[in-house]
Amino acid sequence: MSSSHPAPGPAPHRTGVRTRTAAPVGARPRGRTRVGVRHAAAAVALAALLGGVTGCGDGSRSGRDGGRAGHGSGEQAAQAQGERGEHSRRGFSLFATGDLLVHDSIIRQARADAGGSGYDFGRMIAAAKPLARQADLAICHMETIYGPDGGPFTGYPLFQTPPQLARSVKEAGYDSCSTGSNHTLDDSADGVGRTLKAMDGAGLKHVGSARSKQERGRPALLRAGDAKVAQLSYTYGTNGISLPENKPWLVNLIEPERIIRDARVARRAGADVVVASLHWGTEWQESPDELQRSVAKKLTASRSHGRRDIDLILGTHAHVPQAYEKVNGTWVVYGMGDQIAGKMNDPRGSMGTAARFHFVPPKTRPGAKDSKGGSRQWTVDKAGFTPFMMKTSPRHTLINLASEKSRGAGDPAQDEAYETIRKAVFSRGAEEDGLRMLP
């Protein structure tokens, strides 16, 4: 199996071909045997779980930014909502970022930032913290699995990340992370178990991988504004590492029919908004590939009783910023690029975007239908993105390129990254559909 490198080099990897994530400069890949994979069975009903959701995560946003303060009990919230009518329900803001790709150099930097004792990833992603904490809902993509508490910790090609990453991400303001990726099975069930245990301990919701059939049937369920948000997560493959026959639920694979079924189960159980996180695409290609486009069209075209099944698609995996596009009236982020990563042969591997969307509730009262036949449909009224760059020298540091540019800072490398990201994001007409770059 070939490794994944920027051009020039081996041919780029495409969705549907089992591949390894991009290697940092100087990395030497190790091989694995390709084995066929079959996916798990149907999703488990979520009504009881969704009915009990009254807050997001551990509620740490309360008092911090006003986004979720004062929800009260579920009964009180329901009564208040019934009194004021659906037309007065609060909307919510969503913030999402790309791959947390923890190469060896990232591990060393986290060790140094912790003073040589433990690992601290917080300084590296500090530039995302104000935006993540300001949003009502912040979502990350946890591409790599975690190693044992005491290590050893490794980067490419079989990742085992220090579990302290979960705490750093939570402290930065994130609520939930997708975990379905081509590296989910780098250490089989043990790696999945360690990763989800650490995320549970940090108070981070997670979806995309699971420790049991029952857990696989549950999306990440989050409260944002007055909405119940269901997050789903799937990957194109697992680098040829087979799912154990007795544990087919370890990771979710991209199968459009299954994604639609899962979304409908979440809808019937009360989810107002369904977000699908998809690990897909051709590495180092800014344009979405054929499978990305076809899956996006199928998912966004799917309707139940006149209501769309998927409200937003957030893509990862390509390691470069990809286009944003409205497909069948639904926003699709084909690829957000990397949020953190070691130095790549291709400088675009250090570039990424943060997706920023604001959802508003339907204007009709519960059960009423609008003129187009939809019912209870939340919609995006503001769409934006923020360009970021991971500076790799003299230390790994995430930089908000739009903020730097607005205050006249930056350098030629940052200016080039800013323009590269802008062109990629707007390459499929998103600007005409209202997408804006935000600091």
Give the predicted meaning of each segment.
Residues 2-9, 13, 57-439:
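Acidic, metal/ion-coordinating pockets
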Residues 13-45:
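N-terminal export and membrane-targeting signals
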